[in-house]
Amino acid sequence: MGLLSILRKLKSTPDQEVRILLLGLDNAGKTTLLKQLASEDISHITPTQGFNIKSVQSQGFKLNVWDIGGQRKIRPYWRNYFENTDILIYVIDSADRKRFEETGQELAELLDEEKLSGVPVLIFANKQDLLTAAPASEIAEGLNLHTIRDRVWQIQSCSALSGEGVQDGMNWVCKNVSTKKK
Amino acid sequence: MALRRLLLRYFPPGIILEYVEGGESKTRSIDLLDLRPDTDVTALVEEIQKREPLITASCLEHITHLVQRLQEKLGEKQNHKFSLFKVLRTHILPLTNVAFNKSGSRFITGSYDRTCKLWDTASGEELHSLEGHRNVVYAIAFNNPYGDKIATGSFDKTCKVWSTETGKCYHTFRGHSAEIVCLSFNPQSTLLATGSMDTTAKLWDLEKGEEVASLNGHSAEIIALSFNTTGDRIITGSFDHTVAVWDVGTGRLLHTLIGHRGEISSAQFNWDCSLIVTGSMDKTCMLWDAVTGTHIATLAGHSKEVLDVCFDYAGQRIATASADGSARVYNAGTKQCIAKLEGHEDEISKVCFNPKGNCILTASSDKTARLWDAATGHCLQVLEGHADEIFSCAFNYRGDTIITGSKDNSCRIWH
């Protein structure tokens, strides 16, 4: 990818290019989701120390997806990547109930960010392949998603591992990009 | 005018004349850019004497001796094998660019963690962490040859100038309306130039701490800039497919180099300020007359984007790096491709010569940096160990130390 390619992806993109920011706590499955989107091997994924960028074609759009590491010490740097974001995807580990409060708090802070104001948000209730996973409806309620009124949002249950539900989420993304970009 | 003393400059080969004129001490250089180990010294010295009035019969012996020393330096066999000396892991996010000071005693690294760190090359010790930017520190530079100041350009739209000695911030330059992605001190270290995604470049007075010129004219992001050796011209390369040549004194646009059919990736003057080389996403590299701004040649051959280009110190050769995974070496005089550097398994984002010009260093997304023989194109060494893409690399002036900066958050020193 190189630094120059990163600069090219940084500039405000033409109509058919979409900048997607993928955030969430560490171990939520962001990188697995990114690789699933790009149809890449997901058997050896390690915690992201920085970021990963991939471009995928979908429904006539070029989706430039930025997957940013979610460990606590690097979360303050998420704002490095806010500029020109078209869609925010927030990933939650649905089986990690102990951290629902933490993830809810991080999401609430993101929704308060001026640079992300009005940006459509898709919440992936990930890891539905695990038996202990909470259903999307429970997460939506726990996170008070119904109180979000300043933007369009959607919660989608998925398994980044199996790929189930991922495409449904991306369809929502493309639909909401098209209304915003046109 | 009275000659006071003669100094050697190894790279590019030259002799510096220190003399007194009107009570003032001045210097000027005799560039010996074509010098080879087998050049006829007697003939060369005669020619120098004819050309340079300060060189009188009494110092011919001294000049001969200096030329011979330069030849010895050029002829030295370098079989140096590099090995990993240290891994520096105090940045907590990916690195951006890296740079040495002139002597190579210190170097700096920029990072997504919003800091620039200053390091001691010999020990690998962190001397200062320059903190204050509110976003990625992308462009960094020492004011070489002095090295007492460091400039940092950030995605936070500001640029800061720091003291190398204390790590204190002298100035914060505000005025750009988008990310600063390239910067350079002028050779006299009186000005700093910054280039931004806001499509402008600016010149800042380092003493007064204020903007002296805004170079407006590009219609898209500026991603490369470079002063010429004398410091009276600056070029800016833009995503608008053009390179602009500006007069530093007046901030006036002198020429626009039009010809590339894709975004510019890199642009540089050669040492004697006669040529400009440009690399582009259109897969080609172009050579231009720096004085008239006219197109001289197109160096084609790469099958994907050219991501970086550079001259060697003497301006005799050009190296190009491409997304096609190869690098190429061209003769700046004949414009012929002399070597293809093949072996990397992914795109090459940076290329540079060692100061002597016999060796080329490339940094790649395949997580390796490689060393190549500049004349034959043979791969001399593969520097392996980084766990992710290498974004930047640099040689020190002596050519015996290399630093590499990676997306894996580490910087490595190789001896």
UniProtKB/Swiss-Prot annotation, chain A:
Taxonomically, which superkingdom?
Eukaryota
Q: Identify the main location.
A: Golgi
The protein's job, in short, is: Small GTP-binding protein which cycles between an inactive GDP-bound and an active GTP-bound form, and the rate of cycling is regulated by guanine nucleotide exchange factors (GEF) and GTPase-activating proteins (GAP). Required for normal cytokinesis and cilia signaling. Required for targeting proteins to the ciliary membrane by releasing myristoylated protein from unc119 cargo adapters into the cilium.
In terms of InterPro entries, this protein maps to: ARL2/3, P-loop_NTPase, Small_GTP-bd, Small_GTPase_ARF/SAR
- Residues binding GTP are 24-31, 67-71, 126-129
The protein's location, in the record's own words, is:
Golgi apparatus membrane; Cytoplasm, Cytoskeleton, Spindle; Nucleus; Cytoplasm, Cytoskeleton, Microtubule organizing center, Centrosome
N-myristoyl glycine lipid attachment residues: 2
Q: Which SUPFAM superfamilies match?
A: P-loop containing nucleoside triphosphate hydrolases
Q: What are the protein's UniProt keywords?
A: Cell cycle, Cell division, Cell projection, Cytoplasm, Cytoskeleton, Golgi apparatus, GTP-binding, Lipoprotein, Membrane, Myristate, Nucleotide-binding, Nucleus, Protein transport, Transport
Q: What's one GO BP annotation on this UniProt entry?
A: protein localization to ciliary membrane
Ribosomal protein as a keyword? no
- What's the protein's topology in the membrane? Peripheral membrane protein
Q: Which Pfam families match?
A: Arf (PF00025)
Q: GO molecular-function annotation terms?
A: GDP binding; GTP binding; GTPase activity; magnesium ion binding; microtubule binding
GO annotation, cellular component aspect: axoneme; centrosome; ciliary basal body; cilium; cytoplasmic microtubule; Golgi apparatus; Golgi membrane; midbody
Query: What Gene3D superfamilies does the annotation carry?
Result: P-loop containing nucleotide triphosphate hydrolases
Family the entry assigns:
Belongs to the small GTPase superfamily. Arf family.
Task: Give the protein's recorded name.
Answer: ADP-ribosylation factor-like protein 3
